[in-house]
């Protein structure tokens, strides 16, 4: 009797190991995309924003959720600076078209502090930007949580 019970339990465990989640369960999972911007280049910034917009539109058409985090650090922080961003209007439009909380613009505080020291004044950030302690650590932690990583 015990042998039969153990064999049934073993078969059940093996079956569960080789059974994937149903397509309906996969569709219910939100997608997570982290996009890195580390260059002070309007083309790279626009490419990152285009990637984000394309992902939003794609998943919206499929009635699926997507969370996007665009993290700017190093020279790429200019993307989120209120005084130097060449793409601030596009950032505002993108933020306005997306459900609140579905897109975040993360600004590296290490870079911000370095720029403030070098320039001798406070660096104004766009209102859409959220300052994170370290951009590279932020991206790394998102990846550890299962986010897909994109570098345009």
Task: Label every model-predicted segment.
Residues 23-152:
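Secreted/extracellular ectodomain signature
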Residues 1-4:
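N-terminal secretory signal peptides that target proteins for export/translocation
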Residues 8-17:
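Bacterial N-terminal signal peptides
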């Amino acid at each position: 009797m015990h042998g039969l019970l153990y064999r049934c339990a073993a078969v059940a465990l093996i079956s569960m190991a080789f059974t994937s989640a149903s397509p309906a369960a996969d569709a219910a999972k939100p997608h997570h995309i982290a996009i890195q911007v580390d260059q002070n280049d309007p083309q790279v910034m626009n490419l990152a924003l285009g990637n984000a917009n394309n992902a939003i539109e794609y998943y919206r058409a499929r009635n699926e959720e997507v969370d996007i985090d665009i993290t700017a650090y190093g020279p790429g922080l200019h993307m989120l600076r209120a005084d130097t961003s060449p793409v601030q209007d596009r950032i505002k439009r993108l933020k306005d078209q997306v459900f609140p909380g579905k897109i975040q613009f993360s600004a590296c505080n290490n870079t911000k502090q370095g720029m403030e020291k070098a320039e001798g004044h406070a660096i104004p950030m766009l209102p859409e930007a959220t300052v994170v302690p370290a951009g590279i650590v932020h991206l790394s932690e998102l990846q550890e949580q299962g986010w897909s990583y994109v570098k345009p």
